[in-house]
Amino acid sequence: MRIIVMGTPDFAVPSLQAIAAMGNGFDIVLVVTGQDKPRKSKHAAAEASPIKQAALALNLPVHEVDDVNDPHFAEIVAAYKPDVIVVAAFRILPPAVYSQARLGAFNLHASLLPAYRGAAPVNWAIMNGEEETGVTTFFLQQRVDTGTIIMQQKTAIAPEENATELIVRLANIGADVVVETLRRIAAKNAATAPQDDSLASRAPKLTRINTRINWEQPVATLHNFIRGLALKPSAWTTFNDKTLKIFRTTLSTPEHDHPSAPAGSLLVSHGKLYVHGSDGWLELLALQLEGRKPMEAADFARGLHVEGEALRLV
């Protein structure tokens, strides 16, 4: 089986490595990724994507693409005569590209479709307080994330697990699912099931707007929102007109309580830093103020010199 793998971030790397280890006629003929990113320093070499680095380590051919809709790209894909195209965290492919695969093109998606269709399924699942998620492989079709499902694998979301941690776990779970999906396609027993659009939910791209913290919410909701955006792009608020990124929190009550404090108030109690939501206090554990390095919230609290007093955060 001739396989083309398309992907960019770390999420795609375990799948590439797992396919490369299959042997027995499962051959990666090309790895497609985005173009190298220029670094901030003028003298530094451009940065290759994680999947390109992994592909080169495996001595696999790599093609960097700028525009997947360029007709020339479809011609390049066709020239490799792929039996299957495997996509993991890549761009939206046009039919002219994915139709080049003789046995079909499938995507590895980090949710239990039709839940959380879109660019940020892991983040939104945690932000919404889900206790379970998983991965799905499905055949590509023109509408994004709507193709027929080949395989799914569920996993529980731990109460304190953040998006960065969960993405790593799902990438490894997904690699096993990708391998089994390829085996089923090769054996011509890849049974599929259509998605029920009535059960669909969205996971839109993360932006500066939808990652800002609204403190007028219950602390459990705030905790989920913050861990769902950690460590990147991170949830944020403002403090003294500067951006304050919040990386880690825990549900904890301070000894010095100010029950009438408005939402968004900061409190330092016994060296710990808390912020008030709509129904109580949330302990902050790790953060970063604009212009400074990431730090433990306790270190930030020591610089405030306001033990037992409530300050307005936003």
UniProtKB/Swiss-Prot annotation:
InterPro entries (alphabetical): Fmt, Formyl_trans_C, Formyl_transf_N, Formyl_transf_N_sf, Formyl_transferase-like_C_sf, Met-tRNA-FMT_C, Met-tRNA-FMT_N
Keyword ATP-binding: no
Reactions performed catalytically: L-methionyl-tRNA(fMet) + (6R)-10-formyltetrahydrofolate = N-formyl-L-methionyl-tRNA(fMet) + (6S)-5,6,7,8-tetrahydrofolate + H(+)
GO CC list: cytosol
Any one GO molecular-function label of the UniProt entry: methionyl-tRNA formyltransferase activity
UniProt entry keywords in alphabetical sequence: Protein biosynthesis, Transferase
UniProt-listed Enzyme Commission number(s): 2.1.2.9
Keyword Transferase: yes
One Pfam family in the UniProt entry: Formyl_trans_C
Organism domain of life: Bacteria
Binding site for (6S)-5,6,7,8-tetrahydrofolate: S111, L112, L113, P114
Spans through the membrane: none
Alphabetized PANTHER family for the sequence: METHIONYL-TRNA FORMYLTRANSFERASE, METHIONYL-TRNA FORMYLTRANSFERASE, MITOCHONDRIAL
Family per record: Belongs to the Fmt family.
NCBIfam families reported for this sequence: fmt
Protein's job: Attaches a formyl group to the free amino group of methionyl-tRNA(fMet). The formyl group appears to play a dual role in the initiator identity of N-formylmethionyl-tRNA by promoting its recognition by IF2 and preventing the misappropriation of this tRNA by the elongation apparatus.
Protein name as annotated: Methionyl-tRNA formyltransferase
Organism from which the protein derives: Chlorobium chlorochromatii (strain CaD3)
Source organism phylogeny: Bacteria, Pseudomonadati, Chlorobiota, Chlorobiia, Chlorobiales
Gene label: fmt
